[in-house]
Amino acid sequence: MCKPQQKHYGRQVMNTQNSLKQVATATMVGTAIEYFDNYIYAMAAVLVFNHQFFHAVDPLSGQIAALSTLALTFIARPLGAILFGHFGDRFGRKNTFVMSLLLMGISTVVIGLLPTYDSIGIWATILLCLCRIGQGIGLGGEWGGAALVAVENAPEGKRGWYGTFPQLGAPLGLLLANGVFLGITAIFGQEAMTEWAWRIPFLSSVILVAIGLYVRLKLTEAPIFLAALNKPKPKRLPMLEVVTTHFKPFFLGMLVCIAGYVLFYIMIAFSQIYAKSAPTVSEAGYAMGLGFSPQIFTALLMASAVSLAITIAASGKYIDKIGRRTWLIWTTVGVAIFGLSLPLFLENGTTTSLFWFLFIGMGLIGMGYGPLASFLPELFPTHARYSGASLTYNIAGLFGASVAAIIALPLNAHYGLKGVGIYLTLNAVLSLVGLWFISETKDKLLS
């Protein structure tokens, strides 16, 4: 039997047994499931869960309670990053990568089987929260594994491009989630969606999980990781090494990620609530909604996925030429400006202005998200890379994404869209501080 060929690029080795198609599919499918889960949960939290799992005295309290369960996932993600990062760094990327997908997928499917508050009372809410924690632990190991499989199998000079493969799962997940919701609503109607049909998207994720498992089980470990296994291992746990020896890239990397997380959840959670809510006025005199139908908003969000996909792919091509840091600096400046212009897009209240808000916002998300799968792993050595990239990415999510929509809702009620925009801009400034002090990694050899 022929051994898999290896090509040498300096000190880095590429294993040609894992083809470009294998790497792209294995990494993209997992991220697609992650974002499919996040999208369907965010939509269900806005449209359904405030009625089915939370009994509140007013609509705003119900929405905040439902959105708070989004935060549970981000609280659990660092635990998943520690757990899966440890096994991924010590024993192998492949099996860890498979286990994180299984935990994430099972937790999502179980949500589709849960009884509601009317059936078992507070236990329905507790079970929903436990499923979100399970999703979070699985997701905590998922992205880091996908990023490492892509980057560690990339030839020299193409790590940025290979790193966009897992990131392209985001627009795929968005399209699938919104398409499923639109299709179910069109077939069964909004009342059925609220009562029982919301379960279908969660149950259907089993198809994506099966595809992901099939592809991932055929992968082999990258030579750069196999070489690291043969070296003496540090006595400290990978997590402890990350937060001590590599604290600077860990901390600065978190700051870099925060603006993108806040923007993402303002786009898919806050803007969804604002667009679909009735055009009422808060006690402070600010508009609380635009009155768009769920179908119109979902269609516009699906159209904006084109912008997300294009900018992710474009980032992969350009960051291998101009560098990750330069690209991210200009992108984050764009996010800061976008935050200040938020009222210009949403106060108008027209379909056209809402479309451009979503299209430009998703484009900026893609520009910032695309480079992360190469940039964050490049900050850490091979023996601590899974833990380092996963912890950095997921703790940033804890501080950025978990509270974004929860903070934005009362900000809008008390200070209007200007307050929400300033909140986004301040987070962009935090990310710019991180980018100012962090090092470029484009030409760094993985070791």
Curated annotation (Swiss-Prot):
Annotated TM spans: 29-49, 64-84, 97-117, 120-140, 168-188, 195-215, 250-270, 296-316, 326-346, 355-375, 391-411, 419-439
Keyword Cell inner membrane among record annotations: yes
Membrane topology: Multi-pass membrane protein
Periplasmic side: 50-63, 118-119, 189-194, 271-295, 347-354, 412-418
SUPFAM superfamilies in the record: MFS general substrate transporter (SSF103473)
Matching InterPro entries: MFS, MFS_dom, MFS_trans_sf, MHS_symport, Sugar_transporter_CS
Family matches, as CDD domains: MFS_ShiA_like
Localization terms from the record: Cell inner membrane
Keywords: Cell inner membrane, Cell membrane, Membrane, Transmembrane, Transmembrane helix, Transport
GO cellular component: plasma membrane
Protein name: Putative metabolite transport protein HI_0418
Protein species of origin: Haemophilus influenzae (strain ATCC 51907 / DSM 11121 / KW20 / Rd)
